[in-house]
């Protein structure tokens, strides 16, 4: 029997998959903070602290990038280039040594951030939601199956703004590896198929404005193009 709803329903957010007609349904978006040493330093951290995570709505996704509108209520809008992981299997208390078995594939993502609102939250002991979780705050490339590329743990991760390089690092510079992140998250949540993890950004984050063109890439994974449009 078909389910009836009291209001109009909505489509499940999803990502295209390289070489496939099927799409990857997105359930939740977890994001890790300060996971590259140099970025940790530029944000005021020091050392291998416990990983910490925040959530973005799955409806913040912008599949395959394209046009992203400058958000409201900010004058300090930042990019953060990240390796994105999509899970095919869930579980609790996942062993880091077997965590790769849970991964469907990888993508290039941007954790777009209203830095001034994030900083206000930090300064006042408030949540970061207004700074991190808002419309169009998670542009993401097509997902590449791990069956095709394996599990990248090294390779360049970079971002150019208007043709000028702003971020450049290597995936091996991560403080917490992808398997370690999955294992840690699974101690606090029951992970599910369709969960997505943004695995942290390297140093070089900075502001952008309407008209700017962003090109992000990760060796062996792909590229993501975004153009900033004026606020709606």
PLM regions with names:
Residues 2-23, 39, 45-47, 115-232:
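Catalytic-pocket segment enriched in acidic/His residues
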Residues 54-56, 63, 79, 108, ...:
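General beta-strand structural signal in soluble alpha/beta enzymes
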Residues 2-103:
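Extended, compositionally biased flexible segments
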Residues 50, 75, 81-83, 104-108, ...:
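Generic beta-strand structural signal
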């Amino acid at each position: 029997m078909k389910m009836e709803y009291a209001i109009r329903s909505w489509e499940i957010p999803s990502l295209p998959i390289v070489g496939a007609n099927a799409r990857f349904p997105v359930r939740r978006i977890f994001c890790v903070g300060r996971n590259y040493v140099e970025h940790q330093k530029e944000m005021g951290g020091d050392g291998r602290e416990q990983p910490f995570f925040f959530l973005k709505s799955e409806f913040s996704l912008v599949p395959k990038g394209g046009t992203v509108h400058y958000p409201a209520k900010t004058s300090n809008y930042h990019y953060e280039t990240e390796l994105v992981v999509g899970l095919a299997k869930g579980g609790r208390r996942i062993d880091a040594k077997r965590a790769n078995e849970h991964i469907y594939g990888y993508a290039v993502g941007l954790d777009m951030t209203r830095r001034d609102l994030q900083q206000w939250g930090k300064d006042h002991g408030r949540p970061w939601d207004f700074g991190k979780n808002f419309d169009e705050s998670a542009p993401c490339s097509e997902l590449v199956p791990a069956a095709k590329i394996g599990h990248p743990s090294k390779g360049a991760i970079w971002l150019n703004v208007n043709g000028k390089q702003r971020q450049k690092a290597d995936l091996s510079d991560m403080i917490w590896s992808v398997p370690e992140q999955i294992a840690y998250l699974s101690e606090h949540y029951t992970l599910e198929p369709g969960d997505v993890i943004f695995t942290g950004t390297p140093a070089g984050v900075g502001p952008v404005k309407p008209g700017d063109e962003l090109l992000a890439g990760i060796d062996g994974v792909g590229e993501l193009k975004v153009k900033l449009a004026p606020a709606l």
